[in-house]
């Protein structure tokens, strides 16, 4: 999927989407022009406030695009986006930083992005990730049948922590690998894992989202225990960064 293809085929979107959407953006790897075989196409659809029934109808109307083109649609009402904007939402910074506008009936969302304040919840996010790590640790001790899923969650945490660190360092990056690379470059030998180790871990996330085959030999209590320690160490670095920035 490419931006060019999306723009050329935009009118093939369901009529209800084109009628109700305030704006449609592509973001993520397609917008960055660094997609690969493991990438999907992320699309944001901003709509006016509507009933829950109408909102569900909008979401269900794109099922063929999701199935046939590996598209993932994020639908948001403007009232929700306005509340997110007040807090300087990471997601909205993601759109502002790299989103590409495909379709627009009103400039309301662009104006909202123009006034987007700085995000101040990074430390709170890191503390929440610490709680998730504790939950995973308890889960593994109680039931080792969820290791593959737990590893996929750890992959998301690894990525999100690195995204948060890049934000704190004033170098926003929402990619799959690039935030990790930047953190490795920043901390050097202090950083708990290598890019290749992270890529193997992230395969567990792709196994859930894209059906990618994984190395079953890695599905062990020892492997996840090792990653729990690595993510804890990464969080310690991230929290120390919060204290100096």
What are these model-derived regions, one by one?
Residues 1-16, 20, 31-37, 52-245:
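Catalytic core of pol beta-like nucleotidyltransferases
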Residues 23-26:
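Hydrophobic/anchoring residues in structured secondary elements
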Residues 44-48:
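Short hydrophobic/aromatic beta-strand micro-patches
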